[in-house]
Amino acid sequence: MSQHKMKIHGQYVKDFSFENPNSPFLPSSKAPDINVMVNINSAKLEGTENKKGISEEKPFHEITLHIEAKATVKDEDVKDDIAFICEVKYCGIFSIENFTELSEEEVRQALFIGGPTFLFPFAREIIARTTSSGGFPPLMLDPIDFETMYQQQSQQQKSSASNSNFN
């Protein structure tokens, strides 16, 4: 992936939820199974071109890093196997220098690799603090290789597009 200078203009929590359905949760002797789902969305912020400091050559994009972590425990003492569900949509507003000189693929790479790479540590901290405040050990998510994730999803999209041509 070639490097492009991205500028972040703001970052924020857009949506957040923590569920602790078995509170007070009786700790199990078994370690919980933790399932983490990650999704990334990008949206060009329409109408920003006429605002001060923003031009069509450098439009703003909102990148949303959506992480959901669900912990389950198989224990006969607990009627519902859900220990907790923590979900955060963490966003950033980005612009890319020399936007008009880049191919569509280069822009997608900058948005779907560079954006989430910047946002992830902040979302990770929110999840760790929240699970700790919920009475659990802090959930420290492993780092995510967003470049590999992007490449895998691009390959899947190409495969499904080529498969759709067969009758």
Curated annotation (Swiss-Prot):
GO terms for cellular component: cytoplasm. Transmembrane segments: none annotated. Keywords: Chaperone, Cytoplasm, Protein transport, Translocation, Transport. The keyword Glycoprotein does not apply. InterPro entries: SecB, SecB-like_sf. It comes from the Bacteria. It is found in: Cytoplasm. GO terms for molecular function: unfolded protein binding. Its main location: cytoplasm. Homotetramer, a dimer of dimers. One homotetramer interacts with 1 SecA dimer. HAMAP family: SecB. PANTHER family: PROTEIN-EXPORT PROTEIN SECB, PTHR36918. One of the proteins required for the normal export of preproteins out of the cell cytoplasm. It is a molecular chaperone that binds to a subset of precursor proteins, maintaining them in a translocation-competent state. It also specifically binds to its receptor SecA. This is Protein-export protein SecB.
